[in-house]
């Protein structure tokens, strides 16, 4: 295992959240396999994100949200030792963008936090969302709530902020590990998906607009 990024990923001393998995034999498991097969076959990412004919949009979106959470959580985990209260006292994306945390429990008003604190709260919050059967039902035949896409938009908008922080403040670490290609591919996959289905407000995409125009067009 010569790739330093992979060494970080499989370092047993690192603690990553367990993956949300799909039960074999379910429709979502089959969709997940199909999506992974498209990526492994080197299919154009723009085509890979498109809804397969005859499939349900909510199922397709649910599969990808869980996958993006797992991947982005992993990417942040590999650079987290360099993202500290001292190095990143404010969760930001350069001097122009500051992200404040708000939830329905402890932080009812937007609150400025350090990047590592923000990330911990974010990953915990998303994990709760995707394991909530009322939002991401796993039983065959259980319908998605009418608010599903609204909930997904909030999750994906917040996940995008992880990319913003990592690219702007920790890209040197990504480069040092030789993992630019991996992270860039993950970003392009994410970008094509959220724009294909209009799942993020274009204003949220502004911090990486220049990089995206070079990478994805």
From Swiss-Prot:
- The protein's name: MOB kinase activator 3A
Which InterPro entries does the protein's record reference? MOB_kinase_act_fam (IPR005301), MOB_kinase_act_sf (IPR036703)
Tell me the function of this protein. May regulate the activity of kinases.
On whether Kinase is a keyword of this UniProt record, the answer is no
Q: Please name the source species.
A: Mus musculus (Mouse)
The entry assigns this protein to a family as follows: Belongs to the MOB1/phocein family.
Query: Which SUPFAM superfamilies would you find in this protein's record?
Result: Mob1/phocein (SSF101152)
Highest taxon above the source species: Eukaryota
| Signal sequence, start to end | none
Binding site residues for Zn(2+): 83, 88, 165, 170
UniProt KW keywords: Metal-binding, Zinc
UniProt key word Metal-binding: yes
Q: What is the lineage of its organism?
A: Eukaryota, Metazoa, Chordata, Craniata, Vertebrata
Q: Which terms does the record give in the GO molecular function aspect? A: metal ion binding
